Curated annotation (Swiss-Prot):
Its main location: membrane. One of its GO terms (cellular component) is plasma membrane. Belongs to the CPA3 antiporters (TC 2.A.63) subunit E family. The lineage of its organism: Bacteria, Bacillati, Bacillota, Bacilli, Bacillales. It is found in: Cell membrane. This is Putative antiporter subunit mnhE2. It comes from Staphylococcus aureus (strain JH9). It holds the Pfam family MNHE.
Length: 160
């Protein structure tokens, strides 16, 4: 977060040093790019990773989530319309590696938003999720647990 603020300050200073009569976005953008280069060169002195990497991970996370949301929505619609007799609803558990409260909450929200699954309970130590799924057959269960693990890996990558 400090790197972003520093980069914006560098961009504004760049605009001020250009001595133009009015604000130009192109000047601000060039100052932002210069700040990006400076921060990249000096980022080893910061305690955090280079912030553009985190932005890239967040964009990747959004893409993965949207893909999972669309595919699970189609799967749920398929079950409702064509496979109502084949449904096998039930509970399953998932052990998480997340430790912070915000990460656990975020993973819970992602599971709840995904069609066909919802978090029923989280254990007292916040390490185990109890999830209700529309289908707990072996194939669907493995698919759901893989997608939850993928969400968890992305949350861990963003939070580093």
């Amino acid at each position: 977060m400090n790197q972003i603020v520093l980069n914006i300050i560098i961009a504004f200073l760049w605009v001020l040093f250009q001595d133009e009569d009015h604000f130009k976005f192109s000047t601000f953008f060039s100052g932002y790019l210069i700040g990006l280069i400076v921060i990249y060169i000096l980022h080893r002195f910061f305690s955090d990773d280079f912030y553009v990497r985190k932005i890239w991970v967040a964009i990747k996370f959004l893409g993965v989530y949207l893909y999972q949301l669309i595919t699970s929505s189609i799967s749920t619609i398929n079950y409702i319309l064509f496979k109502t007799k084949d449904m096998n609803p039930g509970l399953l558990s998932y052990e998480t590696r997340l430790t912070s409260d915000w990460a656990i909450t975020f993973l819970t929200i992602l599971i709840i938003i995904t069609p066909g699954s919802t978090v029923i309970r989280i254990s007292q130590d916040s390490k185990k999720f109890f999830i209700h799924s529309i289908d707990v057959s072996e194939k669907e269960k493995d698919s759901l647990l893989r997608s939850i693990k993928h969400y968890e890996d992305l949350i861990l990558e963003v939070s580093r």
